[in-house]
């Protein structure tokens, strides 16, 4: 969290100033990133109403976390420009997707494209990723993780070690070899198996030591990175010296002192598979079934939903549900549920879904059915985001006005 007029990031807050840890988390979901982009544009406008036109998302959150397309949004919101301010304003994000997605996910004739895409997925990734790679390198340049304007957490999965690799600004003091280019991190977290190629790169520290990374989409490990972000904060609090820790005296178990906004890219819980049908599937059907990839749909939905369920129970048990706002739409149908349908019609529809989601009632996941149900008396997501914006603004002003010791 930083002043809109200051180049300093969240880590500049002194220990006595932090009473609430503010977290923004963005799920993965391909071109459906237009949905959270639309919601974030509204949130930033609310912050600008309170603090002026220069206010940016990165000024208000101690941690911004994102997986896959959420990782791209995270990098765009927190990477510095030549004035050490966020590279993108939130209202530019959806426009960025609409402009570049057709080149990231190139599709020609629909029928021929579907056949060709299926054939490519049998022998290699559906897309070569060249446009995405060049675009990210152009936009993010040589900016490394340590230059992000606030603390950033972006999950990936290392296929050489078969374990998650989390790029966290919190860890750089102890793990300098993770200080990778934001472009490499963004390419890696969005390298969805069967859609984009795995990404390899190396880093080198000041002592000449190197580390190799063999990475794929962070959604394999944590498609909803909220819990990952909160865990990084807790680990930081435990490891850091009290006089250096930005979040002291927040105790690692005091989740009631977290203020969390978690935004999904939408899902389709109505598209179910039957055991009788799946029992007959071979490798091909698990990877490609109609316009979807069942195995990928399952692990990304499972990882995201498990986090949502866990956090719902946690904040409820601590009687601080109002500190956790999850915005997700689980009734996507047709092309809207695709991660790579970048037709103008579908992208325009995703913008409308994001706007519609703002006016839907606040909802929480039902632990029995897995569906989202309205929460009585909480109003709409638009109402809650406006309230959160006021709290974020108040917390930022309090930190700015409280004298340092």
Swiss-Prot record:
Active-site positions, per UniProt?
A: 68 (nucleophile), 217 (proton acceptor)
Motif DGA/G: list the residue ranges. Answer: 217-219
Per the Swiss-Prot or TrEMBL annotation, the motif GXSXG is positioned at 66-70
Enzyme's top EC category: hydrolase
Q: Which UniProt keywords apply?
A: Hydrolase, Lipid degradation, Lipid metabolism, Plant defense
Residues in the signal sequence: none
Its GO biological process annotations read: defense response; lipid catabolic process
Q: Which Pfam families match?
A: Patatin (PF01734)
Record-listed E.C. numbers: 3.1.1.-
Q: Which Gene3D superfamilies match?
A: Cytosolic phospholipase A2 catalytic domain (3.40.1090.10)
Q: Which residues form the PNPLA domain?
A: 24-230
For the keyword Metal-binding, the answer is: no
Lineage: superkingdom: Eukaryota
Q: Where is this motif: GXGXXG?
A: 28-33
Q: Name one GO molecular function term.
A: phospholipase activity
Q: Which family does it belong to?
A: Belongs to the patatin family.
Known role: Possesses non-specific lipolytic acyl hydrolase (LAH) activity. Hydrolyzes phospholipids as well as galactolipids. May play a role in disease resistance.
Q: What is known of its domains?
A: The nitrogen atoms of the two glycine residues in the GGXR motif define the oxyanion hole, and stabilize the oxyanion that forms during the nucleophilic attack by the catalytic serine during substrate cleavage.
Query: What is this protein's record name?
Result: Patatin-like protein 2
Give me the gene this protein comes from. PLP2
